[in-house]
Amino acid sequence: MKFIIKLFPEITIKSKSVRQRMVKILQGNIRNVLQKVDETVTVRNDWDKLMVSSKNDSPENRDKLVERLSCMPGIQAFLEVTQVPFTDLHDIYEQTAAVYGPTLANKTFCVRVKRKGKHEFTSIEIERYVGGGLNQNFPSNGVRLSHPDLQINLQIENELLYLVTAIHKGLGGYPLSTQEDVLSLISGGFDSGVASYLFIKRGSRVHYCFFNLGGAAHEIGVKQVAYYLWSKYSQSHKVKFVSVPFEPVVGEILEKIDNGLMGVVLKRMMMRAASRVAERMGVEALVTGESVGQVSSQTVTNLSVIDRVTDTLILRPLIVSDKQDIIDQARAIGTQEFAETMPEYCGVISNKPTVKARYEEVLANEAKFNFDVLENVITSAKVIDIREIANETEAQVQEVETTSALAENEVILDIRSPDEHEDKPFNPEGMTVIHLPFYKLSTQFGDLDQSKTYLLYCERGVMSKLQALYLKEQGFNNIKVYRQN
């Protein structure tokens, strides 16, 4: 099994030294991620492309490799190819005909060739010879150069012919870690998830900073989002998840700050804390999901007042994005379901929040704030390797039984997304299975027959454990985690 990796175009226009560095990093990223799935994977650097090879040709392995490659920054597209040697022009035709000839019935087609090396024929001559032979010897609806039903793609490199059997779209962007690290202020909602993704795609290693306003349930929900983004788009590198217990700060604001300024002051306190966390981590920029005009604290004036609290660079990739565009992108990257069911914690509520805060007035209000409270929560911040979320959950979930057997009056609850459920149906013989996606558990679990015990199932086991903790937090005790032997 072979794949040809096409580089993100902006990589190819860099200077030779920068391009070499970026391609080498991408090569390492691909190797790190794919070898977790398939130890036989090798990655070769061919200057203008990367060649990925695997000795495992099973359909299951192929699907896993395609999934991982499609979510890796730095790849514009990748071609699934069959590599064969050839002797002459007619041999190219015969090998192409053996693969594509039977697929031409009732279709228009064309042949496209890319060639590298010295040969006695041109790329156009190959297209004409192979296309003419297929048209004469196989039933079809003829050759159509524009918008054919089937485009046959061939790549020739010296004495090797690559028959392209599938073309997959890549994520684009720069390879992970070619840009500097950032610290994303993540809340679990639509905006912060998309903002984090955009910086991953741009090649930055994204660490996550969460300000907890709602207890364990809130933290569990946000960890799900951060873990999902890391595991799907950036698992080639280690990142940190930082949790800051911010309830005491909210309490101090409610007690000391004028009503209209509460939102702005809360954001300034968050930026103070995040800047300190970033400094300790050696990170020079913060990322937020703020967009001009979306809420009262996000007017240009208020954002300016917020930014003046720190010298740390604050990056806002969504600053002029419409809310619907953000939601659409969240849906595309897979974070919409998390955001829709994320608990809302409006710890600071202003009856009449100002949209044009005066800097001097903000400073006067903050003079009443006890900054020892802020220092204490910064000191109490918990920093973990994001890979430990699964292990941490394992320890926390000990009070929730894990089992691989189904007893009487027990039902397996498949909490995977509809797409996962459809792609890989889970129906073990002799067991009752109900499909209820994880993002509906918070609103629909209580509607189930509570006389039964439910065994939560997902493929990797992380989501089922996190959801078990969340339901436990909500007071449900008829829960176990199901794990296959």
UniProtKB/Swiss-Prot annotation:
Its EC number is 2.8.1.4. The keyword Transferase applies. Coiled coil: none annotated. CDD domains: PPase_ThiI, RHOD, THUMP_ThiI. Residues 63-167 form the THUMP domain. InterPro entries: Rhodanese-like_dom, Rhodanese-like_dom_sf, Rossmann-like_a/b/a_fold, ThiI_AANH, ThiI_fer, ThiI_N, THII_Thiazole_biosynth_dom, THUMP_dom. SMART domains: THUMP. The active site is at C458 (cysteine persulfide intermediate). It is found in: Cytoplasm. One of its GO terms (cellular component) is cytosol. ATP binds at L185, I186, K267, G289, Q298. Residues 406-485 form the Rhodanese domain. PROSITE patterns: RHODANESE_3 (PS50206), THUMP (PS51165). Keywords: ATP-binding, Cytoplasm, Disulfide bond, Nucleotide-binding, Redox-active center, RNA-binding, Thiamine biosynthesis, Transferase, tRNA-binding. Its main location: cytoplasm. Pathway: Cofactor biosynthesis; thiamine diphosphate biosynthesis. GO terms for molecular function: ATP binding; CCA tRNA nucleotidyltransferase activity; tRNA binding; tRNA-uracil-4 sulfurtransferase activity. GO terms for biological process: thiamine biosynthetic process; thiamine diphosphate biosynthetic process; thiazole biosynthetic process; tRNA 4-thiouridine biosynthesis. Belongs to the ThiI family. Catalyzes the ATP-dependent transfer of a sulfur to tRNA to produce 4-thiouridine in position 8 of tRNAs, which functions as a near-UV photosensor. Also catalyzes the transfer of sulfur to the sulfur carrier protein ThiS, forming ThiS-thiocarboxylate. This is a step in the synthesis of thiazole, in the thiamine biosynthesis pathway. The sulfur is donated as persulfide by IscS. This is tRNA sulfurtransferase. The lineage of its organism: Bacteria, Pseudomonadati, Pseudomonadota, Gammaproteobacteria, Aeromonadales.
